[in-house]
Each structure stands twice: as structure tokens, then as C-alpha cells.
Regions:
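Glycine-rich phosphate-binding loops of nucleotide-dependent enzymes
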Residues: 2-284
Length: 284
């Protein structure tokens, strides 16, 4: 699948401060439909903070985030904004702020996984994915059948099973999620994100803790789900072989600011990137 050119995600002049610490500094990025885009940089560069601003975990100190041409976050305190921001129905947000919560952003069509796997440990593989579907539909996994909604419950269970089959997890459906091998837990976490029917999937270090064989399989898997489900994928990753192999475009940040962007070959040969990051990775 090639990118269509339509901008799915736009991060515009976003700054995130924690007290006197600037974690993200005037960061701007675009992700286009159908792309696999990577955000890379040294530990502590602000990558996960950027994802937290996109997904509503944090409210940006300054700047705006658009998803599908609609504002999901904007904050320009009086006297600091450089322009007015137009939201849905032409509403202007100069000097104001908008901050959608993570659940509302998920409903809009953004799903996310985390660096540290966050499966529901007391649930089976099937229950993990089904519960994600119910959360997307704002239904309770245990009560929907008792509210006269048995038909909808049946549909969700069938869709859950279909998703598990598609992801090669069906034979583990009755096993406790945390009993799976590490690579399969990663796959389950992604399957759970897919259960929310996202348009944009954010992956935070999906290859963390994987061996080379699992990482190679992950590269194939990411391309497969992008094509199968018509996804746009934005990922944070430290495995440079994986990043260079699967990414259409790469942003590089250091100390919260962009130091480079471009296609993999250009980024790989950028001296600032080599000095700040790639040289360190190669020495490890």
C-alpha cells in the first residue's frame, strides 16, 4: 500500500513542559494515509511524551494536534499563540484549548500499544480482545446480553474470533494472556488495538524484548496488518534494522526537538542523526 498524500495526523508546534523541564519543544510532524512512519531518537528524547500528547494522556503546554483534519488537542495560552486554529464547524480556538481524553480519541480512530505490555492479566486471550471491542462500543463485557442486546454481543464475539484467527492467536484463545510467550503477547496487544477498528495505529517500541527472529517476524506482521486493515502506522522504535526496513518516512528528535526527517536512506546518512543517535546505537 502506498501513501495517498492525505494527512491523517498533524502535530503542529507542540511543546510539552513539566515544571521547568521542556520534554517536547515546538515539534511538528505529519503522517499520511497508508504510511508507516517512525519516530526515533535517544532515550529521553521525548518520543513517548509525543505519543502521550497525541493520544490525550497529556495536554500539550502549547501547540495543536489534528486527526483527520479535526482538532483533538490545542493549547495556545493568551499572549503566546501565533495564530488561530480552526476546528470542526469552523470554530476558532485562538487563546483557548481543546483536550480530548484518551477514550474519546480511541473512538475517533486512534489506537495505541505501549513499550511495556499492558494486557489484562486476569483475562484469557479471547477476553482481552473482546473487552477491547466492548470498550470501543461503550458496552460492558458482562452486562450487554442482559440488556436485550444479545445479537450485538454475538456479533462482537464472532468478530473477536475472526480477529484471533487472522492473527494466528485462535489456538490460544482460552489461555491466560500473560501465559503466552513474549512475542505472542506483543501480537495479542496489537490484536487488542485492532479490535477498536482504528484508522491510525501507534506502536511504542513493538520490538522491545524480542529476539532477532521475532523482530523479523514483527516486520512482516506490521506490513501485513497495514495492508489487510487499511491502517496508517506511526511507531517508536530503537531497532534500526526494523525501522529502516519498514518505514516510509522517519522523524528524528533529540532533547524534544526535531533534528532530521526524511526517507530512511536520507536519515541514515544524516550526520546530525549519526552524531546524536545512530553512532551510539552502532557502538552498543
Amino acid at each position: 500500500m502506498s501513501a495517498t498524500g492525505k494527512t491523517v495526523l498533524r502535530v503542529e508546534n507542540v511543546t510539552m513542559q513539566f515544571g521547568g523541564v521542556v520534554a517536547i519543544d515546538n515539534l511538528s510532524m505529519e503522517v499520511h494515509e497508508g504510511e508507516i512512519v517512525a519516530l526515533i531518537g535517544p532515550n529521553g528524547a521525548g518520543k513517548t511524551t509525543a505519543f502521550n500528547c497525541i493520544t490525550g494522556v497529556y495536554e500539550p503546554t502549547n501547540g495543536a494536534v489534528y486527526f483527520d483534519d479535526q482538532l483533538i488537542a490545542v493549547n495556545h495560552p493568551s499572549g503566546r499563540m501565533k495564530r488561530a486554529y480552526a476546528g470542526q464547524n469552523g470554530t476558532m480556538y485562538a487563546g483557548k484549548h481543546v483536550h480530548l481524553t484518551p477514550d474519546k480519541i480511541t473512538k475517533r480512530g486512534i489506537a495505541r500499544t505501549f513499550q511495556n505490555i499492558r494486557l489484562w492479566s486476569s483475562m484469557t486471550v479471547f477476553e482481552n480482545v473482546l473487552t477491547a471491542k466492548h470498550m470501543r462500543a461503550k458496552q460492558n463485557v458482562f452486562s450487554s446480553t442482559f440488556r436485550g442486546n444479545a445479537k450485538e454481543e454475538k456479533r462482537m464475539r464472532e468478530e473477536t474470533m475472526t480477529l484471533l484467527v487472522e492473527q494466528g492467536l485462535d489456538k490460544y484463545k482460552d489461555e491466560r494472556a500473560t501465559s503466552l510467550p513474549y512475542g505472542l503477547q506483543r501480537r495479542l496487544e496489537i490484536a487488542r488495538a485492532l479490535a477498536t477498528n482504528p484508522k491510525l495505529l501507534l506502536l511504542d517500541e513493538p520490538a522491545a524484548g524480542m529476539n532477532p527472529q521475532e523482530t523479523q517476524e514483527l516486520a512482516r506482521f506490521i506490513h501485513e496488518i497495514r495492508d489487510k486493515y487499511g491502517l496508517t502506522i506511526f511507531l517508536i522504535e530503537h531497532h534500526m534494522d526494523l525501522v529502516m526496513r519498514i518505514s516510509d518516512y522517519i522523524y528524528v528528535i533529540d532533547f524534544g526537538s526535531e533534528i532530521a526527517q526524511g526517507v530512511p536512506k536520507d536519515v541514515q546518512n544524516n550526520q546530525r542523526v549519526i552524531d546524536a543517535y545512530l553512532g551510539v546505537v552502532e557502538d552498543e
